């Protein structure tokens, strides 16, 4: 009975945190922000704390777009934007900062170090965080976006099981999504936001 009471209390607490996050986002105004600048500032804060985080910056980014100019079949073409600083989105800056910070923090906790990069397409921008962990599967990570879910690799790592739920909520509130993949040395988390 005591265990059920504790679980109910924790569930209530997490629902309150998620409601707070959602209501906070309603009051924070959408603004035009440079993802390059935001990511650079966040990564710099981690580096100032001697954390192994690297922003894999690109001088220019490939941008893909579809066009149907006087043609019955859409064609895919690629063009380069002049500077990665041109990756602008309309977003709630504090919420985006919270989401990116949480993803980097998770990469450090469970994957030893983090590489952050930015990809842009005509309709969306993707913030990619690669870690060097190896014990979670993509399917397990997808399940971790539910509140109070923690992975099998947590061992003695402190956490509440709400971080990815909050990031997922922030992504959805911006019309975006959170996806997971593997890369040759670990896990990849992709936060995609419409442009």
What is each residue range found by the language model?
Residues 136-148:
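Short conserved segment of the HATPase_c
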């Amino acid at each position: 009975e005591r265990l059920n009471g504790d679980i109910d209390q924790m569930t209530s607490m997490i629902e309150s945190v998620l409601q707070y996050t959602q209501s906070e986002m309603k009051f924070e105004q959408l603004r035009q922000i440079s993802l390059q600048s935001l990511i650079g500032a966040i990564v710099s804060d981690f580096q100032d704390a001697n954390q192994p985080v690297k922003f894999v910056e690109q001088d220019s980014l490939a941008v893909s777009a579809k066009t149907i100019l006087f043609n019955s079949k859409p064609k895919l073409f690629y063009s380069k934007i002049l500077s990665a600083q041109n990756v602008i989105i309309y977003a709630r800056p504090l919420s985006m900062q919270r989401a990116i910070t949480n993803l980097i923090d998770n990469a450090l906790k469970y994957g030893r170090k983090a590489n952050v990069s930015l990809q842009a397409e005509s309709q969306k921008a993707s913030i990619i965080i690669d870690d060097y962990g190896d014990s979670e599967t993509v399917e397990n990570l997808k399940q971790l976006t539910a509140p109070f879910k923690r992975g099998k690799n947590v061992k003695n790592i402190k956490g509440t099981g709400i971080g990815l739920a909050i990031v997922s909520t922030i992504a959805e509130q911006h019309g975006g999504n959170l996806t997971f993949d593997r890369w040759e040395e670990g896990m990849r988390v992709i936060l995609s936001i419409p442009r």
